[in-house]
Amino acid sequence: MLYLLALVTVLAGLLHYYFTRTFNYWKKRNVAGPKPVPFFGNLKDSVLRRKPQVMVYKSIYDEFPNEKVVGIYRMTTPSVLLRDLDIIKHVLIKDFESFADRGVEFSLDGLGANIFHADGDRWRSLRNRFTPLFTSGKLKSMLPLMSQVGDRFINSIDEVSQTQPEQSIHNLVQKFTMTNIAACVFGLNLDEGMLKTLEDLDKHIFTVNYSAELDMMYPGILKKLNGSLFPKVVSKFFDNLTKNVLEMRKGTPSYQKDMIDLIQELREKKTLELSRKHENEDVKALELTDGVISAQMFIFYMAGYETSATTMTYLFYELAKNPDIQDKLIAEIDEVLSRHDGNITYECLSEMTYLSKVFDETLRKYPVADFTQRNAKTDYVFPGTDITIKKGQTIIVSTWGIQNDPKYYPNPEKFDPERFNPENVKDRHPCAYLPFSAGPRNCLGMRFAKWQSEVCIMKVLSKYRVEPSMKSSGPFKFDPMRLFALPKGGIYVNLVRR
């Protein structure tokens, strides 16, 4: 018995040492930060699914108001959380080449070759190739299709709201963004069966699992073990979708030159030349396997539909709570649409100045893309400090913390679109507003996201008002199992026909 007790004691001691061995890293370097917990580091609440990770980072941001750089532990791995906007500007923009990678690599067969997670060279080539899909000219050509999707969406709202005006607004607007992404990006017209399949798939994509924590504990392990952040069912679905869509198109271009047209062009080339930083640099071409192609379809779908749906959910919630803002917005929508014979055009959207402010303020208060992550490609001393981050270490920027900091946004809990008047914007630090990140690696589809959201909002508010629901009257309790921050149980509003 004594031997067993001694063995257990020794084993416990070894485990404690192993899971705390790095915890003096920042203390030795005189970098302030929260006290880590064995095994969990500073992420205990998110690992135990008590809070979303984004809210854990916000809490750390709030805890150290006088620090420029905060030393944190993502599990047992030393990382930093940046608070100083000038330093953030250096990392994201001025010294971008030192932080070009996100540091989240996983199996290329498990969707890891997508443009969001791709490393520097692969990312550059993919970004350059897909940028033409999101030019102003391309988006203008998509507006009539977005408007048609919006009209069908209103018809579906008419049906459900007649018998049940109280609706989960997130579930509702998801149907619009799913259908719109499918139509504008993939050239697909979704039927009810496909919508149900995508709704089921949502749970697999946006329910958090422990792959990310494993990669924090052992950086690079997912890539080494050919593992993925997403379940096999997700990659299998997008592999099949890619195959079926390309087979349907059979090399015939669409009238609007959508993403599938670009993918068909890439397929014919077989490889994609990687960008060279220097003229004489020897780089290998990226082989365009079916896995690489389906990874792009996955990320454009994932990023395009859920971020917009979540943003609109919060926007309609705030309008229901603030009827004066809703009245002003409805008046603008009615006036602008009347000048354009009810048609939503590029010129029409350009005149929707108050809608733009409401949208921007929603993303200020609820930055659904959560936090920005970058990996150091070299040892780097943060400007204005003597703090060095080592090559391979991770940087976190708490967008939620910055954009709800009273230092930059007085009374941050107040929903105030006037924060985005031109005179207020010009006096604000450029890195005080980062819903789409900043610099060369900002969100490629941010204009698409804004336009599709504005089309949906205009369609809804031209026919309906939103009013508060008793189901969503209390303080939010964010769902710790959801990848993007969304209240547990969703958000409900009452849809009232105008």
From Swiss-Prot:
Amino acids binding heme: 443
Q: What's its membrane topology? A: Peripheral membrane protein
Principal EC category? oxidoreductase
**Cleaved signal peptide residues:** none
Superkingdom: Eukaryota
Subcellular localization, per the record? Endoplasmic reticulum membrane; Microsome membrane
Reactions this protein catalyses: an organic molecule + reduced [NADPH--hemoprotein reductase] + O2 = an alcohol + oxidized [NADPH--hemoprotein reductase] + H2O + H(+)
Q: What is its main location?
A: endoplasmic reticulum
Q: Record's Pfam families?
A: p450 (PF00067)
Induction text: By xanthotoxin, a secondary metabolite abundant in the host plants of this specialized herbivore.
Keywords, ordered alphabetically: Endoplasmic reticulum, Heme, Iron, Membrane, Metal-binding, Microsome, Monooxygenase, Oxidoreductase
EC assignment = 1.14.14.1
The GO terms describing molecular function are: heme binding; iron ion binding; oxidoreductase activity, acting on paired donors, with incorporation or reduction of molecular oxygen, reduced flavin or flavoprotein as one donor, and incorporation of one atom of oxygen
* One GO CC annotation: endoplasmic reticulum membrane
Entry's InterPro entries?
Cyt_P450 (IPR001128), Cyt_P450_CS (IPR017972), Cyt_P450_E_grp-I (IPR002401), Cyt_P450_sf (IPR036396), Insect_CytP450_Detox (IPR050476)
Tissue expression remark: Midgut microsome.
Query: What are the names of the required cofactors?
Result: heme
Function according to Swiss-Prot or TrEMBL: Enables the insect to feed on furanocoumarin-producing plants and evolved as an adaptation for detoxification of xanthotoxin and other furanocoumarins.
> Which family does the similarity line name?
Belongs to the cytochrome P450 family.
What is the protein's name according to its record? Cytochrome P450 6B1
Q: Which organism is it from?
A: Papilio polyxenes
